[in-house]
Design a protein with these regions (language model features):
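Bacterial N-terminal signal peptides
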Residues: 6-15
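Boundary at the C-terminal end of the N-terminal hydrophobic targeting segment
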Residues: 18-20
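Ligand-recognition surfaces built from glycine- and aromatic
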Residues: 23, 28-31, 99, 203-246
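Extracellular glycan-recognition surfaces and repeat-rich motifs
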Residues: 31-69
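Secretory/extracellular carbohydrate-interaction modules
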Residues: 58-143
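Residues within well-ordered beta-strands of beta-sheet-rich folds
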Residues: 99-107, 171-177, 190, 221, ...
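Short, aromatic/His-centered strand-loop micro-motif at the edge of beta-sheets
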Residues: 146-173
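Carbohydrate-binding surfaces in secreted/extracellular proteins
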Residues: 171-202
């Protein structure tokens, strides 16, 4: 029996290690800041009519903003980028240490805007750009933005021929590695399997941050955060998958 114990122990350790290397689906989202109105957010085909801080599962989400809709975050009422206010409807998910993959089919519709962020890695900072952001401009071209702590070649746009034009379904993927001990994130973004943006080894702000998951806890944001609205716009995210591997 004593001879068998080391054998079973080795098998147990191998299985535990193998399990730790497997991708695990994560699906605990919640509303960011609040609801603009009863039509601004649709989750899994059902409108979110009341604001709650509770978490929920998401397979598909539709974000809709009309001209003049102001977001519910405190900063949204303040002028920014030459515009009087920001429009916003977003949901968030905690970013876990290790490797993360977010995937979704994105479909836009409606009027253009000067700029609209549709994916962010945020660290809860109250001022300045967060570590990693992906947006569309008024011509629907995808552009990268990031904090001032990252420079080329670590942070750069690799393709200037990537668009989210209304009526065109696109497969978007984000590969994000969160190094908890180093307090850094690395992100690579793909559109229809083409690498279009990279933000590598971007430091997180560790001074005074206060996000929805507590101080110094980074998170993912998807949806619409825009300035320079010209009309009603929707961003639809279908087949949403978020998975993590430690």
């Amino acid at each position: 029996m004593r001879l068998l114990f080391p054998f079973f122990f080795i098998i147990f350790m191998f299985q535990s290690f193998s399990f730790s290397q497997e991708w695990i689906i994560k699906n605990k989202w919640k509303i960011s800041c609040g609801l603009v109105n009863k039509e601004a957010l649709v989750i899994n085909g059902k409108p979110k009519k009341t604001y709650s801080k509770n978490e929920f599962k998401v397979d598909g989400a539709i974000f809709k903003l009309n001209k003049g809709d102001v977001g519910k975050c405190k900063s949204d009422k303040k002028p920014t980028g030459g515009y009087k206010y920001s429009g916003r409807q977003e949901i968030t998910h905690k970013l876990l240490p290790g490797k993360n993959i977010f995937e979704a089919e994105i479909l836009t519709a409606g009027a253009p805007q000067y700029r609209s962020h549709f994916f962010q890695i945020h660290d809860g900072r109250s001022k300045g750009k967060p570590p990693s952001m992906v947006s569309v401009n008024k011509d629907w071209m995808i552009r990268n933005q990031h904090s001032i702590d990252c420079f080329k070649p670590n942070c750069k746009q690799l393709s200037y021929d990537a668009y989210l034009k209304p009526g065109e379904r696109k497969n978007f993927k984000a590969e994000v590695e969160y190094k908890n001990k180093e307090k850094k994130i690395s992100a690579k973004y793909y559109l229809d399997n083409e690498l279009i943006i990279q933000h590598l080894n971007v430091p997180l702000d560790t001074k005074k941050t206060d996000g929805p998951y507590g101080p110094n806890r980074p998170y993912i944001k998807i949806g619409m955060y825009r300035i320079g609205d010209t009309g009603t716009t929707t961003f639809s995210y279908n087949k949403i998958v978020l998975k993590n591997k430690r």
